[in-house]
């Protein structure tokens, strides 16, 4: 819990320092990942940080993923938090297409 609190504080400092206009993208590979990614939204809401959630699959909708990553900076995203189960390619694929920091979240496969 101490680590999470320090992370939360540092995360807010980074986001707020860059610009009040920036927001966070929370991207998941499928709706089944929403329960895990909801923890991210809780932290962001607690700090009053703007965010958008999106379901984009690196495997099922690669064109959509490519378009999202290529336009993320133009769309005022300062950080992307991406999570997916299985092979978890989503964070790496998005990261390869943008200069925006991407945080990968491992999600348990069922």
Regions found by a protein language model. Name each.
Residues 68-88:
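Short, structured active-site "lid" loops
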Residues 4-7:
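Short hydrophobic targeting helices and cationic amphipathic motifs
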Residues 22-60:
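Glycine-rich phosphate/diphosphate-binding loop of Rossmann-like nucleotide-binding domains
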Residues 97-110:
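Short, acidic/small-residue loops that bind anionic groups at enzyme active sites
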Residues 53-73:
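N-terminal beta-loop-helix "entrance" segment that forms/cooperates
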Residues 33-38, 62-65, 84-93:
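Short glycine/serine/threonine-rich phosphate/pyrophosphate-binding segments
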